[in-house]
C-alpha cells in the first residue's frame, strides 16, 4: 500500500481538547466532499473548506512511519500523531494504524465521518458536513463549523461524543460568525467555542 501525503510536519495542535499538544501532522491528499480545485468549489459539499490538500508525495508504509518518527524530538516520549486531510480515511488502513502504534504513537484522526474506521484509533474528531451521511456512530470530539447551511447543532444532541465544539466559519464574515457561535454556546452549554489558535500563534 502506498499513501499520498500532501504534507507532514511537527507542530502544536491548534484546536480542540488537545490544544497546544505537540503533534506530528500527516495530511493526506484527497477528499470525497470536494476535489480541492477552485473551479469545483460551487459544487463542493463543504464550499467553505480552507485547507489545501491536493497532490503530494507517495510514501510506502515503512517510509511514512519512519518520516513521522524522524520528526519527533530525539529522546522525547509521549509521541502523538494526527492523521488529517482532505479526508484521511480514504487512505488510512489497519496496517498504518498498527505501525504507528508499534512506533509508540498515540494516534488521532480528524475526519468528516463519512468513512468507517479501519482499526483502533486513540482519538477521533468528527466534523460533520451538511448532506454527507455519517458512517461513524461516536467520536471523542464532535467539531461543527458554524453557521453552516443545512445543518443544525441540535441534530447531534444524541450523538455520543466526549466534547462538542462549534468552530466559527472562516472568511470575510469571521467576526460575525464567531459572535454567533459564542452566542449559541452560551445558550447551549453542552457546546464549547473552538477557535483556530494555531492561526493566532502564527504556526501551521
Model-predicted segments: where are they?
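Conserved Radical SAM active-site core
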Residues: 3-6, 10, 22, 33-121
Amino acid at each position: 500500500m502506498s499513501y499520498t501525503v500532501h504534507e507532514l510536519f511537527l507542530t502544536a495542535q491548534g484546536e480542540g481538547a488537545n490544544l497546544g499538544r505537540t503533534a506530528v501532522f500527516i495530511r493526506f491528499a484527497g477528499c470525497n466532499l470536494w476535489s480541492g480545485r477552485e473551479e469545483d468549489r460551487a459544487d463542493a459539499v463543504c464550499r467553505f473548506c480552507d485547507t489545501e490538500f491536493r497532490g503530494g508525495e507517495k510514501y510506502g508504509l515503512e517510509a511514512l512511519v519512519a518520516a513521522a518518527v524522524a520528526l519527533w524530538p530525539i529522546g522525547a516520549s509521549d509521541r502523538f500523531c494526527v492523521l488529517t486531510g482532505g479526508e484521511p480515511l480514504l487512505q488510512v488502513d489497519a496496517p498504518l494504524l498498527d505501525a504507528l502504534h508499534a512506533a509508540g504513537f498515540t494516534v488521532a484522526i480528524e475526519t468528516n465521518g463519512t468513512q468507517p474506521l479501519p482499526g483502533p484509533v486513540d482519538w477521533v474528531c468528527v466534523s460533520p458536513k451538511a448532506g454527507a451521511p455519517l458512517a461513524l456512530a461516536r467520536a471523542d470530539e464532535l467539531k461543527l463549523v458554524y453557521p453552516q447551511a443545512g445543518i443544525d447543532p441540535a441534530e447531534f444532541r444524541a450523538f455520543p461524543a466526549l466534547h462538542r465544539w462549534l468552530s466559527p466559519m472562516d472568511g470575510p464574515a469571521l467576526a460575525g460568525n464567531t459572535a454567533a457561535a459564542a452566542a449559541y454556546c452560551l445558550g447551549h452549554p453542552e457546546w464549547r467555542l473552538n477557535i483556530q489558535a494555531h492561526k493566532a500563534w502564527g504556526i501551521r
